[in-house]
UniProtKB/Swiss-Prot annotation:
Gene3D superfamilies: 3.30.1490.270, 3.30.590.20, 3.40.50.11290. This is Putative glutamate--cysteine ligase 2-3. Residues 373-858 are annotated as: Unknown. ATP-dependent carboxylate-amine ligase which exhibits weak glutamate--cysteine ligase activity. It comes from the Bacteria.
Length: 858
């Protein structure tokens, strides 16, 4: 078998040259090339294009660094002339009358021979070269790789605009390119000699003048032992080039292994290959592609995943699997360049915005390695983002800017990108984000509002270090296991009370204690979903702030926040190596299935239970139901008959085994069902009978009680025999006379909270409170001390947040979600909640917003 580790790959990229003032394609490549070396930079057919040639290498990261360096040098040389390179299949603004072919005898003869076909080649591509042992092997490889070429084209699609108008295609370049008489699907050849004879016959016929004019989608090199991929558009995002190069090398490697094993390439029909290529050019990543062998339509993202699995053995042998898998996830999440260009145009209807996007994506890339999760070395960190950070003055621990005013290493690439975009562009992107949110219904209702509003998503992402995430994962899994044990104990023997771990009054007086909490069986999972809120203190360490065990919300907003960020700010998409969010709905569905009662046989029927569109988080309910593929049900559509729960739809009953409850249990149990009777009694009987599960379980509110919070560290030791991994905020229980005395004596230094408060309501922050507020809360504590707790003030960490065209240091917390099946699973998505400027309350119900949260893999 060939040594996979020594297969070199190289890339040729073509770049349009645009005037940075008019954004128009201009014939000034020769001026730029005079400033660059001829080994790496060369002219093309038209004077408006420059080609770069990478060094062949076996290392994709080295290839990436080389491509970035070539782009940087080209951009610098062009920039000195007021020009910029644009890596895309086509550009939106051009005047054909101003363009001409390069001064080269071969190119001039091609123009004479082919006329308009040559003159209209206002296109750019990216070509990948992979080493093979000889040209005979290269010819054999061509047939093996052919079925996957349309997928690679779809990944590269970057040419929706042609001659100033939307072509309706994702890759208009493909249609223009295929007008050459020798472009498109290669024929079937057994040997290089057969192929060479065809070339000789074509030259003899006068159709072409030399072997270089054979423009098949994949071909052997005319002068090197390589196989060349030529089907792809030029890609603005250099990581897309690396993705395509890595996949193509793996396809070649797989083909060689099959050939060496005596395999024969399955013969796809040329007609289907042409159809598949057309479909990829038409749809890009946003539609279906053609399954060459099944001949049916397949979603592009599903085809990409199939391709990855097909060549995974080769990618693993090249040590490329993790990189390519991450880049594929990034590409699928961001969508094609064609999609991003159309979105840019849709915002204001300006083709200049499309050109600016292409220029920015071509030029504005982090230093080599930065987008792969490696912080670049910086000699002068204090000079990063000097404009955006000019007025940025955090009062305490800031997660992005250190105490000396320097940007922390993990945020340098982020801040550079934001600085390059500048305030005006960032304001435009905020407007585009709000418009897209409104169109997609990503809303939330703030307390006191009669209508929903777009959920505030900040454009500056937050990064949680991989080591921090590992500690949080251990600590939160431990915490949920202890709380699960406590809930079973509270509604069972109450051993923790008998053993003095929790005072009796804490349980008996808890607002969340419910008689219906005894309905689930001893083996039931009570905490199917938990949302644990954490903060970083003044030293940067993590503290648990609150447990949410009833109807924790926010996971859909975390997922949609990522999608919005990738849509409206593609220059700042999460780099490879960041945990994906695409698995979140499946993880939730798995947890809900695990919560099914023992009476269920077969696949449990799951439904999301909502109070309806008036609910503040209805968007989340609907989104989760849709992405899990389960029905969204309101109480009025539920019927319990003979201890079995049904949803009634169009007069038909359909059994429900698991109800994912996104409604307060008191409201649910009082609501009339499909038969007009209150649901509570019948639904609880069904739960007791083991015929239906309600997740989260009734009565869970005692587990997230603010007094109970003070005893969770003891529970960890008592139930699990372990020491807590995570610390809590120091808490004083006013139901304890000594602790109450301390709270009353230090009201102006503490945060006091009502035990039954929700969403930040009733909270008084002593250092920020007015005297009358302190007097009022003192009277309330004295009147009913068991209803109050006091906590030490935690100087919440701050994070740069875009507000009124500048960055403000705003307080942030982190809601981490834990799904409990057989064992708790910490979901690879977190909601970073951000307070309004000047506030410490991050709750969305009080006007807080959120940030996209990047969690690197370890």
């Amino acid at each position: 078998m060939s040594d996979a580790r020594n297969v070199a790959v190289g890339v040729e990229e073509e770049f349009h040259i645009l005037d940075l003032t008019t954004r128009q394609l201009v014939p000034r490549a020769e001026e730029i090339l005079q400033r660059l070396d001829k080994d790496s930079f060369s002219p093309e057919l038209l004077k408006s294009v420059v080609e770069t040639n990478s060094q062949p290498t076996v290392d994709l990261l080295a290839l990436r660094s080389n491509l970035l360096d070539l782009r940087r040098r080209l951009a610098e040389a062009a920039g000195e002339l007021g020009l910029g390179p644009a890596a895309s299949g086509t550009v939106p603004i051009l005047d054909m009358d101003l363009l001409d072919v390069s001064r080269d005898a071969r190119y001039e003869q091609m123009t004479e021979d082919y006329q308009i076909v040559a003159r209209e080649q206002l296109i750019c591509g990216a070509q990948v070269h992979v080493d093979v042992a000889d040209r005979d092997l290269a010819m054999a490889v061509v047939a093996w790789t052919a079925p996957w070429l349309p997928m690679l084209l779809a990944l590269s699609a970057s040419s929706p605009y042609w001659l100033g108008a939307d072509s309706g295609y994702a890759s208009m370049r493909t249609l223009v390119w295929q007008r050459w008489p020798t472009a498109g699907v290669a024929g079937s050849f057994q040997t290089a000699a057969e192929y060479d004879q065809l070339i000789a016959d074509l030259i003899k016929s006068g159709v072409i003048s030399d072997p270089g004019m054979v423009y098949f989608d994949v071909r052997p090199s005319a002068h090197l032992p390589t196989v060349e991929l030529r089907i792809c558009d030029a890609c603005p995002d250099v990581d897309n080039v690396i993705l395509i190069a890595g996949l193509f090398r793996a396809l070649v490697g797989r083909a060689i292994e099959e050939i060496e094993a005596g395999g024969q390439a399955p013969p796809p029909r040329a007609e289907l290959l042409r159809a598949a290529t057309w479909r990829a050019a038409r749809s890009g990543l946003e539609g279906d592609l053609v399954d060459i062998f099944g001949a049916g339509p397949v979603p592009a993202r599903a085809m990409l995943r199939r391709m990855l699995e097909e060549v995974r053995p080769q990618l693993e042998r090249y040590d490329d699997w993790e990189l390519i898998d991450n880049l594929a996830e990034q590409a699928a999440g961001r969508g094609s360049s064609a999609l991003r260009q159309r979105r840019a145009f849709a915002r204001r209807g300006l083709l200049t915005d499309v050109a600016d996007l292409i220029l920015a994506e071509t030029r504005d890339v982090p230093p080599a390695g930065a987008s792969l999760g490696v912080a670049p070395a910086v000699s002068a960190p204090d000079q990063i983002a000097p404009i955006l950070l000019e007025r940025y003055q955090p009062a305490g621990y800031d997660e992005v800017v250190d105490e000396h005013g320097a940007v922390r290493p993990q945020y340098r690439a982020v801040m550079r990108t934001l600085e390059r975009l500048g305030p005006d562009t960032l304001d435009e992107r905020v407007g585009a984000r709000e418009a897209e949110q409104t169109d997609r219904g990503i809303t939330f209702r703030v307390n006191g509002d009669s209508a929903s509003r777009p959920f505030p998503f900040d454009i500056v992402p937050r990064i949680v270090a991989a080591d921090d995430w590992a500690v949080l994962g251990r600590g939160l899994g431990q915490r949920v296991r202890a709380l699960e044990a406590f809930l079973h104990d509270v509604y069972g023997e109450r051993a923790a009370v008998a053993d003095g771990i929790v005072p009796p009054w804490v349980v008996n007086d808890a607002p969340g204690l419910r008689h219906g909490g005894r309905a689930p069986g001893r083996d039931a999972i009570r905490i199917t979903t938990a949302g644990i809120d954490l903060v970083r203190g003044g030293d940067g360490g993590w503290l648990v702030l609150e447990d949410n065990l009833r109807v924790p919300s926010g996971i859909a907003y975390a997922v949609e926040g990522r999608r919005l960020a990738e849509s409206v700010l593609p220059e700042l998409g999460p780099p490879p190596g960041i945990l994906r969010l695409g698995t979140v709905p499946a993880l939730l569905h798995d947890a809900l299935v695990a919560a099914a009662p023992p009476a269920v046989t077969g696949e449990p029927a799951v439904a999301v239970l909502t109070s309806g569109p008036a609910d503040s988080a209805y968007f989340e309910h609907a989104m989760l139901a849709e992405e899990m593929g389960v029905p969204l049900v309101e109480p009025g559509a539920l019927l319990v008959d003979d201890d079995v729960a049904y949803r009634v739809d169009d007069g038909r009953r359909r059994r429900v085994d698991v109800l994912y409850r996104r409604i307060d249990e008191d409201e649910l149990f009082a609501a009339p069902g499909a038969d007009g009777a209150p649901l509570g009694p019948a639904l609880l009987r069904a739960v007791r009978a083991g015929q239906v599960s309600v997740a989260n379980a009734p009565g869970n509110g005692i587990g997230d009680d603010k007094v109970v919070y003070a005893y969770v560290p003891r529970m960890v030791t008592y139930y699990l025999g372990e020491q807590p991994v995570l610390d809590d905020v120091p808490t004083y229980v006013c139901g304890d006379p000594e602790q109450c005395e301390h709270v009353l004596a230090n009201l102006d230094q503490l945060v006091v909270k009502p035990v039954d408060g929700f969403g930040g309501s009733g909270v008084v922050i002593g250092p920020h409170a007015e005297p009358y507020q302190l007097t009022a809360v003192r009277e309330q504590i004295l009147a009913d001390p068991r209803r109050w707790i006091g906590q030490e003030v935690v100087a919440l960490s701050t994070h740069p947040t875009w507000h009124d065209s500048h960055l403000e240091p705003c307080a942030v917390d982190l809601r981490v979600f834990v799904y409990a099946g057989v064992e708790p699973v910490v979901v690879p998505a977190a909601l970073s909640r951000v307070a309004p400027p000047g506030s410490l309350i991050v709750n969305s119900s009080q006007g807080g917003g959120s940030k996209d949260t990047w969690i690197p893999r370890r």
